[in-house]
Amino acid sequence: KKISIANDGGALTNDAGMVLVAEFLKKIHFDQLLNERIYINDGRKFSHHSWLEILKQWLYQLIAGYSRDRDANKVQYDRLFQEALQQENLSSQSMLSTFLHTLTTENVSQLSQVAKDLADLWLDHDNTQHLVLDFDSTACPTYGEQEEAEFIYHYGINGYHPFVTFEGLTGLALDVRHRHGKSYTSTHAEDYLEEMLDRYQQRSSDPLIMVRGDSGFAKPEIFAHCEDRQVRYVIKLKSNARLLDHIQHQVLYQDDTDYTKTEQQYFLMDYRANKWRQSRRVAMKATRFAGSLLFSDFQFIVTNFENLDPKTIFQLYQKRGNMENFIKEMKGGFFAEKTDSTSFTANQARLALSFMAYNIIHLMKHLTFPSTEKATVIDTIRFKLFHIAGRMTAHARQIQIHLSNTNVYDTLFWDVLARIQRLNL
């Protein structure tokens, strides 16, 4: 038989699973959090949507995977989105654009604070005493005449150079700051660190906090902040003539060496750079690659751990590799690298909204997903749980959502929904 296709199926939704997000946000009292944290000046007359309603629609679109602003022109007619957001009519692209360009720098800080509060919800729920602050920077490319965009030599592109901090044990985003393209990796990092230490050291009488960062964060100000506040750190150092001379005199070449295998040797030394106020402990690793006669790769990590051997120090640092996955998830999964607006403040707001959406889903995974699904990335979550065909019907006392009965991940959907409904924060 011939197959004919027509776009006349009626008011169906491809995102019936987004009801999980709606239920989860109710459970964590998200509306209350927005009302407490965010105030956006509204001089409009005869407006149909509050700014916070538009903000929530933006978050839903990000979470559902709609990265383009113009997607709102279709989403606004989706019955599932209307019911989830409890709005009879949703906003179009033009209204979302108006909202974005209404936001001030203070509003951006408020958005970021909500994202931080979401991370704190998990830390409070889990009564976390151990925190790993993973510092990094990333690039958000620009392709037009955006304000504050500059050429970033490290990445070889024009764009912005945000500072990011993730909690290394959970993957929650703790801080995300847009910066202009000329910003160095560690620009203002010591100030951001001090803010985070003020925040998290007040949460517990004796928290165990560790800071990790690459060589871009090897600043004496960062070391001093950590030392003065009893915070541990493992931060990579760039090699220099003094360090290389020392380690090259330490490596051992033995007669029974198997040169067909890679060999690594570890050492410790006390080292003081010219700008440091004191000497510090430096772990060193020398690597001779298989097939080579000489050690040719040397790495250095400065730390204030006193009783750890150098190999363990390197193992602690190497776990920072998860950071790249967290950044990739926020940028690729929640569109944090979008810089479509000419205004720097508007692009700051875009990043802050992605920061918030990322933490909503990360918190949802930690609190309501079965253990086998907690590491799932957002693209897979959308495929398994959110992008489900459905139809909505209105009755006198309730709205019913009819899900496809051929959903392969039906069991997972109902499991997560039950976990959300049992959630008590």
What do the PLM-derived regions correspond to, one by one?
Residues 1-3, 34-38, 77-79, 293-298, ...:
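Short acidic (Asp/Glu) and glycine-rich catalytic loops that position anionic groups and cofactors
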Residues 1-3, 7, 232-332, 415-425:
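An anionic, glycine-rich sequence signature occurring as long contiguous blocks
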Residues 1-184, 189-203, 388-425:
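Dynamic "connector" segments at or just before major functional cores
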Residues 24, 72, 310-349, 353, ...:
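Short amphipathic alpha-helical "interface-anchor" segments enriched in bulky aromatics
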Residues 55, 336-402:
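Basic, amphipathic alpha-helical segments enriched in Lys/Arg and hydrophobic/aromatic residues
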Residues 138-140, 170, 179-181, 240, ...:
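Short, glycine-/Ser/Thr-/acidic-enriched flexible segments
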Residues 183-242:
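Domain-level cores of phosphate- or acyl-group-handling catalytic modules
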